[in-house]
């Protein structure tokens, strides 16, 4: 308690007066004229009042009154709560009279009365005595309204709390035990248990007044709500006693238990229910009683446990649960994967990973997936080739194997240096679901055209004079062009045409970039070629050394045409090979020139060819000088034929190739390109030396590949 003190001035009143003191928490009270002698024949009553909720405490600091037997003459009388606390006179420390000493006077209420009385004189043996009177201090002291007052025998001015009393400085308040509600008078309690809520992880719940008889007409609802992921366990204690009937189940009073809104039991009688695992974090206990009965009720202890999920079980032998645990509880998870070569499937969806989490209701948030064998799908088609299964036909799943192959005779598979022949074209369906080769990876092989291997080669034993009509398949690389007139060319690979630059940019003509490029392949007859259709050109590449404006210089007379689309090779359409050494230009080596050019001053409708020997370069040079020609004859050219022969390429054959059979490989090689000459069948013909341009040709073709 904290104490404050306030000085109160001495009050002087005539006999019979009353002096009220304003409500304060502390102060002092004195006799009239203190510390001077007090007057005779005087009586007054001082009323000390403190705020409600406090008591008055009074202590005398000085006390000097005329002593007398029974304090009959002068005295101070103290009263409170309609009771006298004593009558006092004399001096402090003196045995005479009845001095108050250091005694503390305490009221039960917030008022105290102090009456001061003097008689007509203060004489002792004829001598007038002077007495100072008294000085007293008072203070407001907190009243503990909750303390028992039976010891004092006083009546409580306030009604007692029916259940629980709580004191505070200056007052008190009442409350009720669980299951009861404080009434309007703020002191009495009435049973009210319709919405009791418990949120702790464990605790006790009981019927009202347990183990004494519970009140009648109860409608109690005890709700337990704990964190999600916890499950509640209920254990009833002894005694368990709810009014029942021998023949009818719980007709009078009953205890109903609900978990997650579902009834899990209704109980009464004297046998306690079994321990209950509710598998829920929300439980309600409904307790109903009728108007009578004296049963003792019930009490239970509830506890919580983290909810558990069932052990995950795989749906097939290929599913793997990583780090399988003996037990899974709320917020735990597991990861499922598949054995190599299998993939997770959830419904119809392919999963890259799978994780399932244990939910607060004890179920997994996702159903267990299945593992399905990886399917690589239909193998990619191989242009100019095909594949065959080396495992079960049509099965494209994990570990299936296929063998790619090329259409023989016309195509061969591209090989890598150091690769084993047994592994070429072999692809396996991998665990990643892709077809893969050990050397090439995912990239499928290429079927490269086979060059220089005509199915029906020209008969070389026959002596040819003046040219001859070619048969189908003799020169399957032959190309018929119509750009600035008729011309020729040869097929390289399956989409490149080797020809002379001057067929695209003729000498003594203006440079033209928009000329029509008509290219035909696959037959020896012009009309049939037209029926087969023109092959669109994607790109034209002319050697940078070619000069259109220099009419006597055919240096760099070589060009490449890239077809828009690759052609399909066959017996009448095959490429020719490129040279790789100088032996193809040995003196006297026989070669073949074919074309649709002028024959005896007539336009040919069928492919014709001549057989010519490689000539001596010096002889050709001398022959040119004898004709007084200044034409350039460089190391990038060679000549063929003989002045005595009436055989030669002619107008319309330009761009065609000089083809030589390689006796070592039995392949036909394009050693030259028909470039220029002096008239037709009048001596030597001059050809672009292809060997000197092989690097340029390969570079141009590789850039597009």
UniProtKB/Swiss-Prot annotation:
Reported regulation of activity: Activated by the C1Q subcomplex of the C1 complex following C1Q binding to immunoglobulins (IgG or IgM) complexed with antigens to form antigen-antibody complexes on the surface of pathogens. Immunoglobulin-binding promotes autoactivation of C1R, which results in the cleavage of the Arg-Ile bond in the catalytic domain.
First and last residue of the signal peptide: 1-17
Chain positions with Phosphoserine modification: 206
Biological process according to GO: complement activation, classical pathway; innate immune response; zymogen activation
Domain CUB stretches: 18-141, 193-305
Domain Peptidase S1: 464-702
Domain of life from the UniProt record: Eukaryota
PTM note: Cleaved and activated by autocatalytic processing to generate Complement C1r subcomponent heavy and light chains that are connected by disulfide bonds.
Domain EGF-like: 142-190
SUPFAM superfamilies documented for this protein: Complement control module/SCR domain, EGF/Laminin, Spermadhesin, CUB domain, Trypsin-like serine proteases
Subunit architecture: Core component of the complement C1 complex, a calcium-dependent complex composed of 1 molecule of the C1Q subcomplex, 2 molecules of C1R and 2 molecules of C1S. The C1Q subcomplex is composed 18 subunits: 3 chains of C1QA, C1QB, and C1QC trimerize to form 6 collagen-like triple helices connected to six globular ligand-recognition modules. Within the C1 complex, C1R is a dimer of identical chains, each of which is activated by cleavage into two chains, heavy and light, connected by disulfide bonds.
Protein name from the UniProt record: Complement C1r subcomponent
Taxonomic source organism: Pan troglodytes (Chimpanzee)
Protein's gene: C1R
